[in-house]
Amino acid sequence: MISQQAHNLWSRRAFLKVSLVGMALIGSRLALPDWASAEALPEGRLRLFNVNSQERLTVRYRNRLGRYDQTALQDINYFLRCYHSDQVCQMDVQLLEYLNQILSLVGQGKEVRVFSAYRSPTYNNLLVRLGRGAVPKSLHTTGQAMDIAIPGVRLSQVRRTAQMLKLGGVGNYARRGFIHLDTGPVRYW
């Protein structure tokens, strides 16, 4: 039996390998190599609730063999659109995998509340001008960021898990009720 720390390290390494290969295969119908097969990879399934549009989406975007469902990815892109302008952006698949990895560790099967995902540059600039906490070169404008909460899981637990994975930025906005995740450089605030 492996320790929890070793399991977490193995999971993180497997996730990183799978993410890199997954990005390379995004448009293909090829399966992942054996080292990234069913044992190393939880199925890419998400249950999402958009707090702005009040929409729900339950979707399997990747099977356990690593095949991405292009229709499901398009559904996710639309679901995570800029709610201010209705513009759609291709979301970073690594962001979906990051969220899926967090869920596999702290909230498998739970619904994720999405407070913000893609923001059009125009809307982001408006938020900057209004002093609403947005930054000028936000990764939200490139589909690489998402602000989330997982009902039934403490925000501190989501934050610690995301930080442990070291897959991108993690912002603590507990007073506003969410955690920021992005696929930019590893950093915490």
Located regions from the model:
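N-terminal export signals
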Residues: 2-8, 14-35
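C-terminal segment of N-terminal export signals and the immediately downstream linker at the start
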Residues: 29-59
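Extracytoplasmic/secreted envelope proteins and their assembly/folding machinery
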Residues: 96-100, 124, 155, 159
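Acidic helix-start/capping segments at beta-turn-to-alpha-helix junctions
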Residues: 111-125
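Charged, often glycine-rich, active-site loop that binds/positions anionic groups
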Residues: 121-138
